[in-house]
């Protein structure tokens, strides 16, 4: 590379300016949603990253909703029936789920699906990719169904792996809440067990979980991790790994910036939810 080319690139990206001017230029571009220009893809970073974010949302949003809908009741039931057969079975499965990496679980499910296909000729769910061949010729609803069909296996993997940890946390919080004096007082007053559990114990047990909701939004950027790589899902993680291997600085920095912004938004939402869940918190 000639010195003239280096000087031109430094001027193009503002690297010849003082540090404070570079920072102000970066803030100006960030406020205008300009995350830079990709060297590898020869396109603005936002145009490259945003479609991948949407693809990851197809997996992350449903798996997060299913996580709360399944893991919370499982944790509550485990706390109410502590050391019962069902609690022991669920605890064993939870520890097993924590021990198995989600990408390895994806490989196991892919193997089982392929075995069913080889034996019966029926492909229960696609094992890779996001769309079928001829996708562009499909109608709108056919496209929706096709993407949803391809998303089933990775969503099952993500939900199963996350349920293990979340249900254990929910169970522990419920056990602690059920041992508190206010629960014994509520029972002594003759309140129905349903009211004691769901209005008093659960509402307090869920507070630490709500406080950690702020960390969920950045997962929309981090995506489904290696599950996307294993299942060839065109999400965030494959693009990030490709950008790192090609030293595409602005794409990597764009990921980090979007993750930081979503983390701040998530923390704000968790604070607002805490005020709704916990009556002791009031914002003036």
Model region roles, listed by residue range:
Residues 1-24, 117-144:
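Hydrophobic alpha-helical transmembrane segments of membrane transport/permease proteins
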Residues 5, 19, 23, 35, ...:
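Hydrophobic side chains within well-formed alpha-helices
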Residues 17, 24-29, 93-129, 157-163:
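Membrane-water interface segments at the C-terminal ends of transmembrane alpha-helices
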Residues 1-16, 46, 50, 68, ...:
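N-terminal signal-anchor/first transmembrane alpha helix
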Residues 53-86, 102, 130-284:
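Alpha-helical transmembrane segments of integral membrane proteins
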Residues 21, 36-39, 105-106, 121, ...:
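Short, hydrophobic secondary-structure boundary micro-motifs
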Residues 18, 22, 26, 44, ...:
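Amphipathic alpha-helical recognition patches that constitute DNA-binding helices
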Residues 15-72:
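An internal, D/E-rich "acidic patch" concept
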């Amino acid at each position: 590379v000639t010195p003239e080319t280096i000087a031109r690139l430094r001027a193009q990206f503002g690297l010849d300016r003082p540090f404070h001017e570079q920072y102000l230029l970066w803030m100006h571009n960030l406020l205008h949603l300009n995350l830079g220009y990709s060297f590898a893809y020869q396109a603005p970073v936002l145009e490259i990253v945003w479609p991948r974010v949407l693809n990851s949302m197809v997996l992350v949003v449903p798996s997060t909703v299913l996580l709360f809908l399944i893991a919370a009741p499982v944790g509550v039931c485990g706390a109410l029936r502590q050391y019962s057969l069902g609690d022991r079975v669920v605890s064993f499965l939870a520890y097993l789920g924590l021990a198995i990496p989600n990408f390895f679980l994806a490989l196991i499910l892919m193997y089982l699906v392929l075995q069913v296909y080889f034996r019966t000729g029926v492909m229960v769910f696609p094992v890779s990719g996001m769309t079928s061949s001829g996708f562009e010729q499909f109608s709108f609803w056919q496209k929706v169904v096709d993407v949803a069909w391809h998303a089933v296996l990775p969503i099952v993997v993500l939900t199963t792996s996350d349920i293990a940890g979340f249900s254990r946390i929910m169970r522990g919080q419920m056990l602690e809440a059920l041992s508190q004096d206010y629960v014994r007082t509520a029972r002594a007053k003759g309140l129905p067990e349903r009211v004691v559990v769901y209005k008093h114990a659960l509402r307090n047990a869920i507070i630490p979980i709500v406080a950690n909701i702020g960390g969920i939004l950045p997962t929309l950027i981090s995506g489904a991790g290696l599950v996307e790589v294993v299942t060839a899902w065109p999400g965030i993680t494959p693009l990030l790994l490709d950008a790192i291997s090609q030293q595409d600085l602005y794409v990597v920095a764009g990921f980090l910036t979007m993750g930081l912004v979503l983390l701040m938004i998530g923390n704000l939402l968790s604070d607002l939810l805490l005020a709704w869940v916990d009556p002791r918190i009031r914002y003036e």
